Amino acid sequence: MPKPASQIDPAQAGVVADSPDEEYASRGGYKLAGALDILGEDAPVIKGKRCLDAGASTGGFTDVLLRRGAQSVIAVDVGYGQLRWSLQQDPRVEVHDRTNIRYLDPQEIGEPAQLIVGDLSFISLKLVIPALVRASTADAEYLLMVKPQFEIGREDLGAGGVVRDPADHFHTVLAVIAAAKENGLGLKQVAASPLPGPAGNVEYFVYLGRGAAMPPDEETRELVRCAIANGPAGQEKTEK
């Protein structure tokens, strides 16, 4: 069983291994970098990998991948022209704007991705995972950010669209992991994002592997519990 990831102090979340001289392209960059640092030695290898950024937007995740040695990044987003200009001009970045990742044709990206990261809004990861698998190599890895506010039913959302109940976090993360299992992926680790979303939503990274073993159910649940307890939601509960 993987050992639960340890949470870092959110105040130190901007202190990452690549020590950027300038800010990341978006706040999302600090979320991914923070999660990678939390995972530590258990984090996926980025250097030399062909990567795919699902929901690239302004390029926070793409930025982190490049700074940590990605060979190339396929930046996919349903919008247009959002990616930071410097990233658009980087020869290592392949821009696929106006592309709904759920319906991505693998032929559109050429060589499949070895590592896929994702920061998607207004859609459940459960609907997207099949497309991500089709766009990846047989031994690919995935580090996907679960946003409970887009996984839970609208009737369960709190004021301002914030999911505050850790029990809801637990069940939404487990549901994404179950969808991953149905698509041939195994769970490697779970970590809370050290930075909440703009409205205060706590988000979680699930680290998955294609063809990797899925831990027994209780071990999976324990990984999720530990991620919640060590993350902002657990800290908030402790402070009350």
Feature map (PLM): residue ranges:
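S-adenosyl-L-methionine
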Residues: 72-127
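Short, glycine-/aromatic-enriched active-site segment of Class I SAM-dependent methyltransferases
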Residues: 148-165
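Conserved class I S-adenosyl-L-methionine
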Residues: 45-57
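Glycine-rich SAM-binding Motif I of class I
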Residues: 59-60, 81
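S4-like RNA-binding module at protein N-termini
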Residues: 1-42
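Flexible, glycine-/basic-rich loop-and-beta segments that form/coincide
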Residues: 202, 208-240
